[in-house]
């Protein structure tokens, strides 16, 4: 297939397009982007007939900042006949030799206009699933190890059809995790950290590295949205902020409130596992703070937000992440770095930093 379909947040098409253009070029998969502002998706059209297949297989989705989900796609079906919408979509998959898939997702971009098609998509899934099973494109039973068929309706009668590989795909419909806001969470920002843990760590990794007894620091904690997520996972938290903290959080006995500036705070003990930070500040300044903590060896893993500028957002993030990498190498710090524009992020990205990952969890245990 020649087209790579990428879901993103509406308004971030340019960033998603710039990123896929750069990453595809690094992999020698030539092509060009097609996108429209606020459509919430980007098409990367490859010059080679199998270019999108290469990207769907070899370009890790979790290495992309602005794409929520991606799949190798056909050309746009721009006028699907009302009397038979199934036939052309099935034919496209057969022509591309897509068979024995384990799941079907009929989706739309994440815009109010496209979501008006959601009811139709749910109804259409039934006859489409039957049609795909009949010709062997879809297995009779769901199989989480097989490719996933995607049909994305971008308008009435207009759809892209294709596939993603189960080991390089978001497990979530449209790439959007469905998280519930806890009634006792101090603020909606709590969902950002909840989503971040799920985005950057598997369930098994969370059980090992987000467990009860670990020490954590939350810089810029007030009123406690991010602290809440650490507390509910059983951690002991130093909440750093000049503002007031949520009373219920303080009553848990797991939080110590330091009335201080997050940029000047130094932890009294250095057995911290998690450092989290969601401060409204210049992204370069937050990055420098994380670099300083890493060089001092004050934490093991960090999740922090970088607020984005109005222009050149992808370029700015790329420069900051590359600079962090250079500084860590200069200081002989082994690290892993991931960055994602999460669903619950707005004009910001969330970064996960893991320092000396080969050392494991033990040295930062509560002691």
Swiss-Prot record:
Keywords: Cytoplasm, Methyltransferase, rRNA processing, S-adenosyl-L-methionine, Transferase. It comes from Shewanella denitrificans (strain OS217 / ATCC BAA-1090 / DSM 15013). Monomer. NCBIfam families: PRK11760.1. The keyword NAD does not apply. Catalyzes the 2'-O-methylation at nucleotide C2498 in 23S rRNA. The keyword RNA-binding does not apply. GO terms for molecular function: S-adenosylmethionine-dependent methyltransferase activity. This is Ribosomal RNA large subunit methyltransferase M. It is found in: Cytoplasm. InterPro entries: RlmM_FDX (IPR040739), RlmM_THUMP-like (IPR048646), RNA_MeTrfase_FtsJ_dom (IPR002877), rRNA_MeTrfase_M (IPR011224), SAM-dependent_MTases_sf (IPR029063). It catalyses: cytidine(2498) in 23S rRNA + S-adenosyl-L-methionine = 2'-O-methylcytidine(2498) in 23S rRNA + S-adenosyl-L-homocysteine + H(+). It is an enzyme of class 2 (transferase). GO terms for cellular component: cytoplasm.
């Amino acid at each position: 297939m020649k087209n790579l379909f990428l879901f993103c947040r509406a308004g971030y098409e340019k960033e998603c397009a710039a990123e896929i253009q750069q990453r595809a070029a690094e992999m020698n998969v030539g092509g060009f982007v097609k996108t429209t502002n606020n459509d919430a998706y980007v098409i990367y059209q490859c010059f080679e007939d199998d270019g999108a297949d290469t990207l769907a297989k070899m370009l890790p989705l979790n290495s992309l900042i602005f794409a929520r989900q991606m799949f190798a796609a056909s050309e746009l079906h721009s006028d699907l006949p009302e009397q038979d919408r199934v036939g052309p979509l099935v034919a496209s998959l057969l022509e591309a030799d897509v068979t024995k898939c384990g799941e079907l997702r009929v989706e739309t971009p994440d815009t109010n206009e496209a979501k008006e098609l959601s009811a139709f998509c749910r109804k259409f899934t039934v006859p489409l699933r039957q049609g795909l099973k009949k010709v062997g494109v879809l297995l009779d039973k769901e199989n989480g190890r097989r490719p996933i068929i995607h049909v994305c309706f971008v308008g009435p009668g207009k759809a892209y059809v294709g596939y993603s590989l189960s080991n390089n795909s978001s497990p979530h419909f449209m790439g959007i995790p469905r998280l519930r806001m806890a009634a006792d969470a101090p603020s909606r920002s709590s969902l950002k950290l909840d989503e971040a843990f799920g985005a950057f760590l598997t369930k098994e990794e969370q059980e090992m590295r987000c467990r009860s007894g670990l020490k954590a620091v939350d810089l810029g904690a007030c009123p406690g949205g991010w602290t809440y997520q650490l507390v509910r996972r059983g951690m002991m938290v130093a909440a750093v902020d000049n503002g007031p903290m949520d009373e219920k959080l303080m009553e848990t006995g797991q939080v110590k409130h330091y009335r201080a500036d997050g940029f000047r705070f130094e932890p009294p003990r250095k057995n911290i596992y998690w450092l989290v930070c969601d401060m409204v500040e210049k992204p370069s300044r937050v990055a420098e703070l994380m670099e300083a903590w890493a060089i001092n060896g004050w934490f093991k893993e960090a999740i922090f937000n970088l607020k984005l500028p109005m222009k050149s957002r992808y370029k700015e993030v790329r420069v900051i992440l590359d600079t962090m990498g250079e500084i860590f190498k200069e200081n002989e710090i082994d690290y892993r770095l991931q960055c994602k524009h999460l669903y619950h992020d707005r004009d910001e990205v969330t970064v996960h930093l893991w320092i000396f990952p080969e050392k494991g969890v033990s040295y930062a245990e509560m002691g």
